[in-house]
């Protein structure tokens, strides 16, 4: 059942308490948008193939989480999910040495942090010289 249960903080500003939205359908706006806040949408699927289909149909791909005890399943899903970061059996901790960025319309298709970010500021040039 889909419930909208956002209760706002009494502090000045726009704050939302942590909220779960259960029973989402793939075509609902909340299931199709990136929400940056303490919000978790729950969209139940029957199997891995349906989960990959739902993830692939999204126009965003910043982050996904996989929870399983089967390491082969974890690798298969992590390789197949169209996201910039995949967490397996954990949440994303992040580290300045690891690249951060998304796929599709999540981010600028570049990576912040890590050598990928440094390389985006460089231009590689190859020069061949015949010296006689």
Language model segments and positions:
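Conserved small/polar residues in nucleotide/adenosyl-binding loops
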Residues: 1-5
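Conserved C-terminal structural/oligomerization subdomain of aldehyde/semialdehyde dehydrogenase
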Residues: 8, 15-132
């Amino acid at each position: 059942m889909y419930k909208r249960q956002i209760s706002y903080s009494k502090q000045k500003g726009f704050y939302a308490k942590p909220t779960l939205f259960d029973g989402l359908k793939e075509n609902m706006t909340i299931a199709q948008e990136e929400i940056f806040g303490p919000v978790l949408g729950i969209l139940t699927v029957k199997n891995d193939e349906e989960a990959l289909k739902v993830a692939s149909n999204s126009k965003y791909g910043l982050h996904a989480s996989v929870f399983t005890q089967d390491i082969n399943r974890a690798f298969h899903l992590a390789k197949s999910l169209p996201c910039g970061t995949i967490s397996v059996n954990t949440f994303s901790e992040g580290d300045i040495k690891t690249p951060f960025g998304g796929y599709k319309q999540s981010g600028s298709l570049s990576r912040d942090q890590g050598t990928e970010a440094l390389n985006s500021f460089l231009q590689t040039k190859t020069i061949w010289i015949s010296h006689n």
